[in-house]
């Protein structure tokens, strides 16, 4: 098994025995070791580097994003039923919006917005609950009428629909590109 180590803005490749590299180039210790080069591990590396941490190493047994990240859908919804998740999703979306400019590395992020349709009063009650959470974290959201739905998406057939939950900053990103942009950002931050 080979391991790829990303640290100090460098990319090292070694095998289990530590071969393939001169001994003086192999990282033997670090303040923080992050296992896994998917979007979560690289995000942690990026954020720590951005906060000024220097003694960081990321270990990945394959290539960056070679696990579940490369085939993830990359959806970035704001509609969450818990405060903590809503805050995380908002922070992630805000990061994806500025990451490409910061790193000059494409992320594939598109903020296209979304609509969740209500067919019964209970749906609208749930939307009101979630809107309270999103208002609290600062994520834009609104409960809209069928007339407003038609303005946003004129091709939706409105039979049985009584309203919708509109989150205009929902989007999607390319997980592999976003991960690579965060890896570049981590290198840029030292």
Model-derived regions: residue spans:
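Short, positively charged and aromatic/hydrophobic N-terminal segments
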Residues: 8-17
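A short, basic/flexible loop-to-alpha-helix module at the beginning of a structural domain
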Residues: 16-29
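Beta1/beta-strand and adjacent pyrophosphate-binding region of the FAD-binding site
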Residues: 26-38
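N-terminal Rossmann-fold NAD(P) dinucleotide-binding loop
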Residues: 41
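Gly/Ala-rich phosphate-binding loop of Rossmann-like dinucleotide-binding domains
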Residues: 45, 49, 185
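Glycine-rich FAD pyrophosphate-binding loop
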Residues: 49-69
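Dinucleotide-binding Rossmann-like beta1-alpha1 core, especially the glycine-rich loop
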Residues: 74-152
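Helical element adjacent to the flavin cofactor pocket in flavoenzyme catalytic cores
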Residues: 168-190
